[in-house]
């Protein structure tokens, strides 16, 4: 209780100081595409070359317990920009679906309060076009650009230019979203060794124990790490420009990813390999004890209220997250006790939920009869096809076989500290019956409070689960079922549930 009161006091003190200041903080949110938390150097990766992100962490705050709401591109990004759970964003709980048009995006609130706002790179949330019967949103961004240029289709080619060309009489918010490291490895095709250094050597990459260690998997991983290095390079270019303009001191920089790596047993998973995101914050004017990491749990729905609060802007009542501004002043501050995540349609029929709390992860699976093989681009990958060949020869380890497991357990329970890869399911262990009951009750409470549901008719598979090939001819529309929460009108519910 004492820590909670202290956290509130720190938030209020920080907000009061900022709202009375003439210069509110600038904010840049860098979002990597398909990058796992432990593939960044400052998180202990021996393969990664991420010197710029590592320097930001060394002089800022590395968050070791930042959790996504979905390990899927558009649902995850939609949660960040609205501060809401995927099923509370309307159809946006599923890939390639728009956010309900009545829900405000937090950059719009910044724009309306005097910030210059820009989105450069991958959007992948929705346009400003309304759903049928809904109203049109006011413009969210002053400037939108693909971030691409000849020889660089990674979404970051015009980041520095955007910084340079902004109006200098306004604070700014930039949503800088890279396409790195999404397949099909554009960085390999346009590699500039003068900028990024040598490509990663396949012989030196770390192969996770749930992948098969062979030449094609190693090359796949090396190409993936090349794209992470390119993402890091362009972050460094933006930081250098801010330093040259003497604008770095009062710019809050945050670096994160939308979901885990695009490999088997990562992207779309409710396990840490899918939901645990890297999250690094750097803000010389606003972070005390720089270089001290934090173990405090945060959810990405907390980003919107945090940024708005620091800017002196009232968060919208639709936002379900909590400000973690207190952690910038005190790395031991506690903001939330629980983090909830979802697995909905992403190329394949799916419905799973999870809650993280006090060192445990509980996963429920409402479609246990089918495998969690990952998204179609991962299924088509050399890494997945290598596993498939080993499966057919009967040579998979239990960790490698998990990607093909069907039926799956309907309930999974893990100790995240002792079992970081979540391979030892404790759901049937009587020693953990009390923990399982407590987390199950939390998940039930959250489901009811937020209006979540398990529709009878979910969106069906669009791709073959073995090959990743499309089940319908090119140009045919994707078949859609009922979104989670639709029967409860969950896009109009604002209750956050347990936090």
At which residue positions do the language-model features occur?
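Formylglycine-dependent sulfatase
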Residues: 2-3, 10-12, 18-412, 420-441, ...
